Amino acid sequence: MIANAKTTEIESIEELSVYSLDHSHEGIELLINDSRKCGKDMRIDTRMALDTLLPLTNALHDFDSFEHSLCSLFEVDRKMICDNYGSLETAMDSFRTCMITVEQHLESKNIISLALLLLTKLPSTLERIQSLLPLLRHYIDEKYIQPETKHN
């Protein structure tokens, strides 16, 4: 059993996953803000911005791993986690494309394009994912937690 400061009892990986998704909004907001700040800094002081880019890309990689692990663990079909604007699969594909593009811009030293990506495309992609995470949470809750609650 895991307990947080509010003494919420978490007794299963499913509950821990839902708890994590409930608190992911703030983490994604930080990623969005850090991306925009890094993009702005890139236009002013490239060296300083590059120093903040590594922690940002590490955090983005961690988020990607978190999402991938959840979807693998709960056998989520990302195409089914969707709203009127598209699916989690499409949003995560866009996210991964952004990450590849960041690497390409760094390798080619295309700082202007990198700054633009960090200011616009990456934050909008993260916002899109952020809007879909409550649906992922609902899916896990409905499929894995609620049935367990009904049996107890």
Residue spans for each PLM region:
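C-terminal-biased regions
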Residues: 1-152
